[in-house]
């Protein structure tokens, strides 16, 4: 389960950022997780519950925003929705689509006090 190491890194970044900004507690964390990122949101939530204890994020809520897959078709020049990595362009059917969204995992923001 790679979600555990991902969430350990998220908590480490959140706690370090809180410390650098003089915060004593983190109230909430919002993540952007792409639907094509191969990251399971339910597993992230489970891991979050396990790794936040004993940190400044101990009582922080977690919100996960799912980011849709999107790409730029190099053949027809359109921005298109992607349902899978390396999928075909839904307009022209060709596979020369450069992914532009949907594979990210990032901390969108956090609320501290």
UniProtKB/Swiss-Prot annotation:
One of the protein's GO biological processes: protein modification process
InterPro entries reported in the protein's UniProt record: Hydgase_Ni_incorp_HypA/HybF_CS, HypA/HybF
Record carries keyword GTP-binding: no
Binding-site list for Zn(2+): 73, 76, 89, 92
UniProt binding sites for Ni(2+): 2
GO molecular function: nickel cation binding; zinc ion binding
Cytoplasm in keyword set: no
Keywords: Metal-binding, Nickel, Zinc
Superkingdom as given in the UniProt entry: Bacteria
UniProt cross-references to Pfam families, sorted A to Z: HypA (PF01155)
Protein family: Belongs to the HypA/HybF family.
Biological function: Involved in the maturation of [NiFe] hydrogenases. Required for nickel insertion into the metal center of the hydrogenase.
Protein name: Hydrogenase maturation factor HypA
Organism for this UniProt entry: Rhizobium leguminosarum bv. viciae
Encoding gene, per UniProt annotation: hypA
